Amino acid sequence: MRLLIVAKLEGHISEAAHLAMQRGAKVSQTETVDQALAALRGKQSADLVMIDVGLEISRLIKSLEQERISTTVVACGVGTDAQAAVRAIQAGAKEYVPLPPNAELIAAILE
């Protein structure tokens, strides 16, 4: 599994990356949607993109669709903010992962 994390790699996001690596995922990271798109356009591919809910999820997903880049997008955010989860799903994310990360939840998403 190749995981691209689109967020600042700190705190709970860093913890989620570590859990994913423990489960065998190859993890890469960018901080912005533009950086993520550039990476995906280049030689880097990802089976799963995990993006911070504070970033432009809808722009990422629209760009992926327009450029015919096929990958699953999952949003993540601190706590159980129901409104943030709804916005992320409405923007096109397949799931919302609350942070701090739960090892079993990370494992389920990677499967």
Question: Predicted regions span which residues?
Answer:
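Receiver (REC) domain switch/output surface
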Residues: 106-111
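A short, hydrophobic beta-strand element within the central beta-sheet of small alpha/beta folds
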Residues: 4, 49, 70-81
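Two-component/phosphorelay signaling modules centered on CheY-like receiver
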Residues: 8-31, 35
